[in-house]
Amino acid sequence: MFQLICKDGHARRGAFTTPHGTVQTPVFMNVGTQGAIKGAVSAHDLKEIGCQVELSNTYHLHLRPGDDVVRQMGGLHKFMHWDGPILTDSGGFQVFSLAGLRKIREEGVTFASHLDGRRIFMGPEESMRIQSNLGSDIAMAFDECVENPAPYKYAKDSCERTLRWLERCKAEHDKLNSLPDTVNPGQMLFGINQGATFEDLRIWHMKEIAKIDCDGYAVGGLAVGEPTQVMYDIIDAVEPYMPQDKPRYLMGVGTPSNIIEGVARGVDFFDCVMPARNARHGKLFTWSGSINLKNEKYKLDEQPIDEQCDCPTCRNFSRAYLRHLFKAEEILALRLAVMHNLYFYNKLTQRIRDALDAGEFEAFREAYSGKLSERA
């Protein structure tokens, strides 16, 4: 259930109740692809850095260790020892990124495992069964994420097929939730808007999927190489047709500025691998812009990564020490850097929520939307 607390223009402050707790929105979901954050960050650490929702990957967990294994271990929450909300994506993005290794038909997709090459079939029903076995709180509908750029005719055929797949997902999801031995009978389902970069397709598709009673709606297939302004234009185009009483999720986005601008356009949920991935390469976010800790100028720098940050890394270690760890290729460098960047993203959405509560979101947007895209 989604409760809209207040609005500032199109920006929304809300609360979304799940079987494993209430999520305060806007929210950034921390990406643990295989049930863990890359960089030796545990579920216990996620609590310390302010994570509300963990996101895991259906495709990867289906291949390894197998969703049947996770089910026998009591579901993903028990398996990874995380008692907060979990969202699982449908596996569609990963399957469709295997361009030369998959074949699409109405029933679903046949693809070759990136691990051992074995042929695997996944369709709407299979995706729902896997996610039911994982026991996540939010399951994502199985969709096709088309390549960018995509021909209009193919994008149209694809989003029509994705609509039919959503209907099948909904039927299978309802059936699975009613079974007596299901891992998480309160699991919710989000539908996904597609249509490439064609606004007319996006609007048509959003209107159609909104007729199917999902628990939330996502905008997918963006941040795949299109100009940032095109992404914003698509969000602006579909937002009027997204149900007001359901959460909105912008998939795979993005930079701190993208998140601020997404909130300004009515988005509630975000996820991205960027903070953890950048951290593993020494690229860290601060309230003054981003820095690259591997640069020579930090060799004798006694400051924390960010004077304004109170994450465990900034409370205890200097830029000079962290630079040394990176240069020495110590695993601790990855852990400390990832924890900082994820803390920063979680703090960013907390500060956005605080600004919305205070009626000061536009001032926050003006102060930080451009600044956070710059180098410090």
Tell me what each language-model feature is:
Residues 1-183, 296-299:
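Non-catalytic, usually N-terminal nucleic-acid engagement modules in DNA/RNA processing proteins
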Residues 21, 54, 89, 131, ...:
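Conserved, mostly hydrophobic/aromatic
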Residues 21, 162-169, 209, 238, ...:
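Hydrophobic alpha-helical packing residues
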Residues 135, 166, 170-173, 177, ...:
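Structural signal for hydrophobic packing residues in well-ordered secondary-structure cores
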Residues 1-17, 23-32, 39-40, 143-149, ...:
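C-terminal extensions of enzymes
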Residues 160-163, 172, 176, 184-305:
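Glycine-rich phosphate/ribose-binding loops and adjacent secondary-structure elements
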Residues 148-151, 156, 216-222, 331-334:
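Glycine- and acidic
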